[in-house]
């Protein structure tokens, strides 16, 4: 009997072809943890307007970023899994995806349980908790019927914040930047009003990272939100708008880090490296650079392995109490 570890990320289409992107978007945007509008109202909009137009456009973006290893998000999650296996040789380390058909959460957990894995630690690869990512993963974990131990967030761990700070310091040292932006995936403000802790946790992440920065003056650091979808208000400031404002203010050299993304994906590779870069340059900006996500880097894998080991130790001590 081995201890089990399951890391879970968002997911990806199985290919960058429009039909597969459409299938992926239909699954993702039908999740009521993501889109809270009543199904009777939302599904006609989704199927009649959004999927016909957004699928081919998103497929174009996926084709830009697709690699020989496939989706960057899945490829980097595989790197993370493999490096965790090196660090935890006595564990059964697996990965799952919330959407997309590959690496389904429920089937993966049931296979691990059938092999006798116990206990099984589940780590959603989202540092900050929110309904639209972590909760929907935990719903599927619960639906599997497999007994698990869940680490549902890790934004406030000092070791994690130190890794982020080191990455930002290293990137900052390579260029003369006027502003360093920590950009998080946005969520609708209605979710926060209804009690979602995401905004507060993002702010705590930013404060913690600033505390550990050694080369970046804290006065140069600010935070934004990106990837807005739909007409309803989302958390502000919006990254795209802020980039235009900074360029207008003469802040022509900007470095962007994305703490809520632990692996490269469309939001980092296409939205930031292409679209936001172009927006910044078109409005008078000069130097736009990004800090790459963790992408299975050694310090992050060290952190995740220790997180899992500490969780098991804490559960064992709790059981003895």
From Swiss-Prot:
- GO CC annotations on file: cytoplasm
Q: Which HAMAP family match?
A: Ferrochelatase
Compartments it resides in: Cytoplasm
Q: Which domain of life is it from?
A: Bacteria
Specify the pathway: Porphyrin-containing compound metabolism; protoheme biosynthesis
* UniProt keyword Repressor present: no
Annotated positions binding Fe(2+)? 185, 267
Family matches, as Pfam families: Ferrochelatase
Q: Which residue stretches, if any, does this entry annotate as coiled coil?
A: none
Outline what the protein does.
Answer: Involved in coproporphyrin-dependent heme b biosynthesis. Catalyzes the insertion of ferrous iron into coproporphyrin III to form Fe-coproporphyrin III.
Keywords for this entry?
Cytoplasm, Heme biosynthesis, Iron, Lyase, Metal-binding, Porphyrin biosynthesis
What EC number(s) does this enzyme carry?
4.99.1.9
Q: Which reaction does it catalyse?
A: Fe-coproporphyrin III + 2 H(+) = coproporphyrin III + Fe(2+)
Question: Known InterPro entries for this protein?
Answer: Ferrochelatase, Ferrochelatase_AS, Ferrochelatase_C, Ferrochelatase_N
Regarding protein family, the annotation reads:
Belongs to the ferrochelatase family.
Per the record, the GO terms for biological process are:
heme biosynthetic process
State the name under which the record lists this protein. Answer: Coproporphyrin III ferrochelatase
Species of origin reads: Lacticaseibacillus paracasei (strain ATCC 334 / BCRC 17002 / CCUG 31169 / CIP 107868 / KCTC 3260 / NRRL B-441)
Q: Which GO terms describe its molecular function?
A: ferrochelatase activity; metal ion binding
């Amino acid at each position: 009997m081995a201890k089990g570890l399951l890391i879970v990320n968002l997911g990806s289409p199985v290919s960058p072809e429009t039909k597969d992107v459409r299938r992926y978007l239909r699954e993702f945007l039908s999740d009521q943890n993501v889109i809270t509008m009543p199904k009777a109202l939302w599904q006609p909009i989704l199927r009649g307007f959004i999927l016909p137009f957004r699928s081919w456009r998103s497929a174009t973006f996926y084709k830009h970023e697709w690699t020989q290893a496939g989706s960057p998000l899945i490829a980097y999650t595989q790197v993370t899994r493999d490096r965790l296996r090196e660090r935890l040789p006595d564990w059964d380390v697996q990965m799952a995806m919330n959407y997309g058909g590959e690496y389904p959460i429920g089937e993966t957990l049931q296979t691990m349980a059938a092999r006798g894995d116990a206990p099984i630690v589940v780590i959603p690869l989202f540092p900050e908790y929110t309904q639209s990512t972590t909760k929907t993963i935990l719903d599927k974990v619960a639906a599997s019927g497999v007994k698990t131990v869940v680490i549902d967030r890790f934004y406030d761990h000092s070791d994690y914040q130190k890794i982020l700070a080191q990455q930002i310091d290293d990137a900052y040292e390579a260029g003369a930047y006027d502003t360093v932006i920590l950009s998080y995936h946005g969520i609708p403000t209605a979710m926060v009003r209804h009690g979602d802790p995401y905004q507060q946790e993002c702010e705590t992440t930013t404060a913690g990272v600033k505390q550990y920065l050694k080369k970046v003056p804290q006065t140069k650091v600010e935070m934004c939100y990106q990837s807005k979808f739909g007409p309803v208000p989302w958390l502000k400031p919006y990254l795209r708008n802020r980039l235009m404002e900074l360029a207008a203010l003469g802040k022509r050299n900007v470095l962007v880090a994305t703490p809520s993304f632990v692996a490269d994906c469309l939001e980092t590779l296409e939205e930031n490296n292409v679209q936001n870069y172009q927006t910044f340059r078109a409005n008078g900006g000069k130097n736009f650079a990004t800090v790459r996500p963790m992408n299975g880097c050694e310090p992050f894998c060290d952190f995740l392995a220790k997180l899992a080991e500490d969780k098991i130790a804490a559960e064992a001590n709790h059981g003895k109490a």
